[in-house]
Amino acid sequence: MPKFALKALWLENDLAIAVDQVVAKNRSPLTRYFFWPRDDAWEQLKAELESKTWISEEDRITLLNQATELINYWQNGGRERPISEAQAQFPDILIGGNA
């Protein structure tokens, strides 16, 4: 049974969010990166996940809730914090970047 996981790029002016499919601990990209606040990453991610009808509603809701939490954290001062703190706050999300 496939599992899905968020990944994020923690950038100076943007937060980029994408979804990977996880099979046997191996990650494969499932979506492109969606950027916040440059674009409405949450709405774009929602539309992309809804277009993949084989992803369960429960998985879509879980991923969107995680994306909401991550966006809120980034917006509310998290972008000023080290990536290591964001990774500790969100251990289920793979976070990288240059900020």
Curated annotation (Swiss-Prot):
Keywords: Ribonucleoprotein, Ribosomal protein. Pfam families: PSRP-3_Ycf65. GO terms for molecular function: structural constituent of ribosome. GO terms for cellular component: ribonucleoprotein complex; ribosome. The keyword Ribonucleoprotein applies. The keyword Ribosomal protein applies. Belongs to the chloroplast-specific ribosomal protein cS23 family. Part of the 30S ribosomal subunit. PANTHER family: 30S RIBOSOMAL PROTEIN 3, CHLOROPLASTIC, OS04G0461100 PROTEIN. Probably a ribosomal protein or a ribosome-associated protein. This is Probable small ribosomal subunit protein cS23.
